[in-house]
Amino acid sequence: MSSLGPLVAADETFNHQIIDTFATVSQADRSWTEKVCAMAAPRDGSVQLAFGMGKYTNRNVLDAYAGISRGREQWTVRASRRLLPDVDHLAAGPITYEVLEPLRTVRFSLAPNDVVPISFEWIFTAALPPALEQREQHRSRDGGRVDADIVRYHQIGTATGWYEVDGVRGTVDEAAVSTRDHSWGVRYMVGPPAVDVEDPARPAGVSTIVLWSPILCERQDGSRYGLHVFYQRHRFGDWQRVELQGGVEHPDGRREPFLQLLPHAEVRDDNRRLVRATLDCTMSDGSTRPLELAAVSETGFHLGAGLYFGLDGHWHGEWRGDLHVDGEYVADCTDPATARRLHQMRDNLVCVEDAVGQGVGFGNMQSIFAGAQPEIGLTEEASFL
């Protein structure tokens, strides 16, 4: 006798792709995740709103984070709840995700709460069509297990809305940039690390650069286009592996891919914050397209507060009961010890000058600079994820 998952509202749609209900995914891996992540910020970098939500069908968990970064300060609310039977309700505690128009308009909101004195609501409006990224698939070091098998699309747009900190309300107008991504599949670092398998710790001597960045650019005539970079470089002695995707994105859906990218970055060694960089890009026709970018301010939400790479012994998708809500205020995220707790990857608002495209852009640069990289002054001793 076969068993089926419970019926949910989505089962009324004509979108089934496996022989089961929408309460079930096609495999039993506990790391299966569907996730959204978004940011919004005015171009002056005075403040940034952050949002993330994950659905872990095989863990019966839906969790989320919402936060505000303002200069060196950061406020975060995290929530986790039992997924079943309310699998279609995309909310956990005070945090809510709502699709207003598919692939076009989304609302991200944080209601007033008892954790930290912040709340917000912003509506993402697409400036460009969503862009499906290449399938991201990584194996364990021994090659025996697929650690990550993810499909992701990102979208570049603008934001309108409001935010409140300590009872003082500010507005987000349509000049603010907003980026979002939506992914699903088997992810790394879901749930506490397994204790009965080989230690996956990073080998000494390995250096890594990861850059992921969607940018909204505008020319003097008001026309818009996007830039997207997803660059990963792993180096060990004379061995090196580079993965690259991205390019120029046009409003009509056309995409001009990057063939090669060479980053030249200035990064603080003590907290691994990206200050500025030149990305020497080569297009598929062989032409060069250098991109000059710089962090707009100290503002930038540390994603570790949303449980990326874990936080204080807790992880994405971890069972916390029927409903659990927590969070914290951090006074200075640039402090090296604090940066290690929150990890270095963050939603860093950057300004980009694209001389070839004749545009200036603003967007989100997530970066990791791990290991010793003496060519840019980074030491092994100061390295952390």
Placement of each model-derived feature along the sequence:
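Structured soluble/peripheral alpha/beta segments that form catalytic or ligand/cofactor-binding pockets
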Residues: 1-385
